[in-house]
């Protein structure tokens, strides 16, 4: 991650940004929205800094930065081999983490020798309701692997068990006449929650759910 705004501007000034097609489309929505939040946060912090006599801060990136970067995006289909520059080729493979996520296979040719490097990115799980199962690139000379959880193991539970647990939470909340607040990532998790809520409504799994308004921020 580049933390200095000037460094980021230098990196993206004229360079193409290769991504999956879905990622490019999502960024058209998410980057301007995130930039607006960055500008608001900086404005709020600067009001406090002015009162305290502290230096002003700049937003991590602005709406103009976002607009400039979006012009550089090049959406690429999964499994298509593209040339990044002479001697460097790449391919995106669907890893089932969220819409547009990918592992990146990179082939680098130096002195007639081709080396294959695989960057895993965040890897999803099998049997997700709205995302394809992850695919595994075959073979690599070097593998750069995500390790979000280190050496910890996930608690093993089936999707059916998780769905029933979610349904039970909703049933309890409705029975108490209370509100249920669910923090969730805007991309991926929120859509999955909506999928399950729709299933509950169609199947009648959660009595009274049809009378409950659902709001998404």
Which residues does each PLM region occupy?
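Active-site flanking residues adjacent to catalytic metal/cofactor-binding acidic residues
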Residues: 3, 20, 121, 145
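Short internal beta-strands
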Residues: 16-24, 47, 144, 210-217
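Hydrophobic or amphipathic alpha-helical targeting/insertion segments
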Residues: 13-35
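Acidic/polar short surface loop at catalytic or gating sites that assists cofactor/ion binding
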Residues: 28-72
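Short, well-ordered beta-to-alpha junction loops that form the rim of enzyme active sites
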Residues: 2, 22, 184-187
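Single conserved hydrophobic/aromatic residue that forms the stacking wall/gate
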Residues: 1-8, 12
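Core dinuclear metal-dependent hydrolase active-site scaffold
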Residues: 67-132
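Cap/insert and terminal regions of metallo-dependent hydrolase folds
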Residues: 103, 124-216
